[in-house]
From Swiss-Prot:
One of its GO terms (biological process) is rRNA processing. NCBIfam families: rRNA maturation RNase YbeY. GO terms for cellular component: cytoplasm. It is an enzyme of class 3 (hydrolase). InterPro entries: MetalPrtase_cat_dom_sf_prd, YbeY, YbeY_CS. The keyword Lipid metabolism does not apply. The gene is ybeY. This is Endoribonuclease YbeY. Its EC number is 3.1.-.-. Keywords: Cytoplasm, Endonuclease, Hydrolase, Metal-binding, Nuclease, Ribosome biogenesis, rRNA processing, Zinc. Pfam families: YbeY (PF02130). Zn(2+) binds at residues 112, 116, 122. One of its GO terms (molecular function) is metalloendopeptidase activity.
Amino acid sequence: MNAVDLIVEDDAWSSLAGKTRLVEEAISAACKELPDRTPGVVAILLGGDEGVASMNAQFRGKAGATNVLSFPAGEHADNHLGDIALAHGVIQREAEDRDIALADHLRHLIIHGFLHLQGFDHQQDDEAEVMEAIERRALARLGVADPYPNEDPGPGPHSE
């Protein structure tokens, strides 16, 4: 299992009970789907929209907050895999718009961010299919509904 360093920066997250357990379970579920994963420590920032918007502008050149940002640590980071930053307001609004629990949406985005730290991407359709299949399986381990219910689940990386 990968270790998690949880940082709660925005007080808006205080209403979510069991944050530490939720984060650790999401990372654990993702790890179970990645037997060849790179082990290490993941820092997870539960932030606000303003802070994530600032990071989005600084590191991606994009205006506004986004739900999740992943920052791989690179080759010379010793045991640190990277950082995942999550914006409470964006995630809360998305959860409400999709009529899903905030905790379930957060689990999904943590898994999504962790997969980026493991080298997965979704820029191309085939990459997205693989990544989404892993997300689906990891979320199913947690009893979380498919976040892509109207899409073909694709073959996934472990299909024969």
